[in-house]
From Swiss-Prot:
Its cofactor is Mg(2+); Mn(2+). One of its GO terms (cellular component) is TRAMP complex. Belongs to the DNA polymerase type-B-like family. It comes from Eremothecium gossypii (strain ATCC 10895 / CBS 109.51 / FGSC 9923 / NRRL Y-1056). ATP binds at G317, K342, N448, R452. Catalytic subunit of the TRAMP5 complex which has a poly(A) RNA polymerase activity and is involved in a post-transcriptional quality control mechanism limiting inappropriate expression of genetic information. Polyadenylation is required for the degradative activity of the exosome on several of its nuclear RNA substrates like cryptic transcripts generated by RNA polymerase II and III, or hypomethylated pre-tRNAi-Met. Polyadenylates RNA processing and degradation intermediates of snRNAs, snoRNAs and mRNAs that accumulate in strains lacking a functional exosome. It is found in: Nucleus, Nucleolus. This is Poly(A) RNA polymerase protein 1. Residues 1-14 have a biased composition (Polar residues). It comes from the Eukaryota.
Amino acid sequence: MMTASVAGNRSGRSGNIARERSNRSRGAQKSDKERNLSKGSSRPKSNSSRVKKMRKSSLSKVQKNFAVFNDSAEHENKYETLAVAEADEKEVILLDEEEDTAMTTETKGVHAEETANVTGAEGVNAAANALDDNQDFIGFSDSEEEVASGEENGDADYAVEDAEDESSEPLPTNADYPWIQNHDHSRQREIADWLTLEIKDFVSYISPNKTEIQLRNDALKRIRDAVQDFWPDANLHCFGSYATDLYLPGSDIDCVVNSKSGDKDNKNALYSLASYLKRNGLATQVSVIAKARVPIIKFVEPASQIHIDLSFERTNGVEAAKIIRGWLHDTPGLRELVLIVKQFLHARRLNDVHIGGLGGFSIICLAYSFLKLHPRIICRDIEPLQNLGVLLIDFFELYGKNFGYDDVGIAVSEGDASYINKKEYPELTRNLRGTFNLVIQDPGDPANNISRGSFNIRDIKKAFAGAFELLTNRCFELDAATFKHRVGKSILGNVIKYRGAKRDFKDERALIVNKAIQENEEFHQRRGRIVHRDTAEFINISDDDDYELQPPPKRARVPAPAPAPADNVVVLDDPADDYVPAQPVDKLMGLDDTDDYLPAPASPTDTPKLDKAAKRNYWLSKGQTM
């Protein structure tokens, strides 16, 4: 019995041990699974976290908050009844600016109920059909090979693109350089040609139209009539930029009042005329400058809003206008170059002589001497109108970098220009500050320096040098750029800015007469008919006087006096046939005279006489020397 019980106890213990081992192995396996699960997933262990119980009050509060979304009366979908528009089913997608064709994809509107019935298998089949139909295309830009082939066949592409540009819509106006609107020259292969065409466009853009010329003519007529009403013996003449067609939009008009008495340049006359113009509504913003070297009246004509400068008893400006018109007629490219330089200085406020800037006449003389002395123009190597870009860069380089302002001056005449040594003309450098200044000899007065008021010449020189740098850098930059990056760019815009009102490209100077030029020509024609009684006195001939050329007086014939008769000659009024002279002809001719001519004998030559002793001593001395 005991043995059986002991055996039973042993078997029970062994069973317990086996069960403990199996439990341990199961626990180890379970712990390994939990470790692997914790490594592979970020979910927390189920045994490690305790479930947090929520209070009943909090649960009811949450239920009330979510109950709001179950109320269909307050929250109804307003877009349930809207139908999908058929026009929106197709959508155009532009892949790239350089692509010739755009890819069109069809996007169908599908309701939510229909999408719920679509299974994953149908989506896979739709993708497979798209691949089979080649509808999965994605557009990219041109490859390198296509770009290379495009560059090789560039001429044909440029022609097609130019045709497209001509038929395209107008380009938007650029506020800084509006003269390039619808005038794109970026297709020019030579940068110099591009700049030349742009200069011509700018000149055409700022040239006056018919309305502007008529506005100035009317304003000038009103002022002239007022001056003649106030002073019957006076007349108004125009000079400066308006009398030479070299004025910018909005520039002033320079006028001069000349009278027969010549006494209208005093202080009393200036204030009297200014008051008269203001009372009659012909002048606003009146300013009388009576203490200046050249007294003037500055005012604004109210009808045209044009600024007018009125001087008195001077004719040099009218004479200069005639000379400048002759230069413009004989020098191609002068007008274009002058207008560019004027606008360049105007934008930098360097064109006002009262603050040391460069005046209009000085600018014209600089441009005229530059063109007359340019070596390639002298040799007829280039045509000025076809090389305005190169000439503009050369102009800025000459007067901004190379011109010797300390030693060199400029002399201009009616048909020629030259450089002069400033030291040889002390009258031109009198009362100037230092040696670094600009000297331009007046073509009408050789002792006058027309640029003596331009004391700010250092800033002007720096501006010219900067313009040269800007233009050359811009030319190199655009020359290296592709044609795509040239579109809409401007070379001249680097140095020229126009901030005025929008204009058109109508140069209508040939359609209407400029009254200032016409009256200036008539003035010189009348001056040519003046009879000079004295160097300082002239006879003024008006337009109403009839001028007739008198034939020169015939010279009276004066009879020559009769020669006096000789003493031995008797003059008979009616000689007879038996006339015998007082002396025979043979005696008069000396035929009977004897030949008593005895020539004087030739005098013998005086030869020096030496004695024998002297000769002997001479030859002895010669022998000793030998």
